[in-house]
Swiss-Prot record:
Coiled coil: none annotated. Its EC number is 2.7.1.50. Its cofactor is Mg(2+). Belongs to the Thz kinase family. CDD domains: THZ_kinase. This is Hydroxyethylthiazole kinase.
């Protein structure tokens, strides 16, 4: 059993936004609707639960829209976009926009496959709060070009920064580019997050679950850049902690859930590395 978590009404003494938002998340336990891919549904739900949020995997048309209006945050992940889920994603995104629910678009493999590419362009036009993807996905979404090998990036993170800036300014969104060093921009400011571990790339859902964490944090702060940075810092610091005790991808996946449960605002403040 993990130690009791501090209340958000207690001062952390850290003065860091990421630490303070972690406290707030654990007090509010935001309800995060996840329209995500079939491969990562269980892992994503467990990540949110371990962190202190409440997952809801509501992805059925006629239910997805109404739920997005009452959820704290919404994730739309295009990893396995079957027909019913595509309908639910568009319905939920429209509802979130109308209700002011912050939402995250993860355009998995955009540019590599036609169905998800059309859907990604339709959804980004609805101005998601955050777009999260690898460098190749961000470039493809911004330029209409090819997007690497499915979910794998073939471009460097720095090479995608111009595309991310264009996306952010065009659609009024924050763009988070995942990589060895995550780059996050609102089109004017750029923050680089220097925490994480390569084992995240060896676990199915390691990146997709971060989109759900971003949706949780986006519900807590009116500045989506600050929220995306906090989500990335907390998640990647937990990954570092998990990697320290892991013997490989299997133990890392379990350890990541334990680390997300155990990570404290004080640890976040100590280990966060931003530039």
């Amino acid at each position: 059993m993990s130690a009791a978590r501090p209340s958000a009404h207690e001062t952390t003494g850290t003065g860091t936004a990421s630490a303070d938002l972690l406290l707030l998340l654990r007090e509010r336990q935001p309800l995060v609707q996840c329209i995500t891919n079939a491969v990562v549904t269980g892992f994503t739900a467990n990540v949110l639960l371990a962190l202190g949020a409440a997952p809801a995997m509501t992805d059925v048309p006629t239910e997805a829209g109404p739920f997005a209006r009452i959820a704290s945050g919404l994730l739309v992940n295009l990893g396995t976009p079957h027909a019913e889920q595509r309908e639910a994603a568009v319905e939920a995104a429209h509802a979130a926009r109308e209700a002011g629910t912050p939402w995250v678009l993860d355009p998995v493999a955009v540019g590599a496959l036609p169905v998800r590419t059309r859907l990604a362009h339709e959804l980004v036009a609805l101005s998601p709060t955050v777009v999260r993807g690898n460098a190749s996905e961000v470039i493809a979404l911004a330029t209409g070009g090819a997007g690497g090998r499915g979910v794998d990036a073939t471009d460097e993170v720095e090479a995608a920064l111009d595309a991310a800036t264009l996306l952010a300014r065009t659609f009024g969104t924050v763009v988070a580019i995942s990589g060895p060093v995550d780059h996050i921009t609102d089109g004017h400011r750029v923050v680089r997050v220097h925490t994480g571990d390569a084992l995240l790339t060896k676990v199915t859902g390691g990146g997709c679950a971060l989109g759900a964490v971003m949706a949780a944090f986006a519900s807590l702060d009116p500045d989506p850049l600050r929220a995306a940075v906090a989500a990335t810092s907390v998640y990647t610091i937990a990954a570092e902690i998990a990697a320290e005790g892991a013997s490989g991808p299997g133990s890392f996946a379990v350890g990541l859930l334990d680390a997300l449960d155990a990570v404290t605002p004080e640890l976040v403040a100590q280990r966060e590395r931003l530039a």
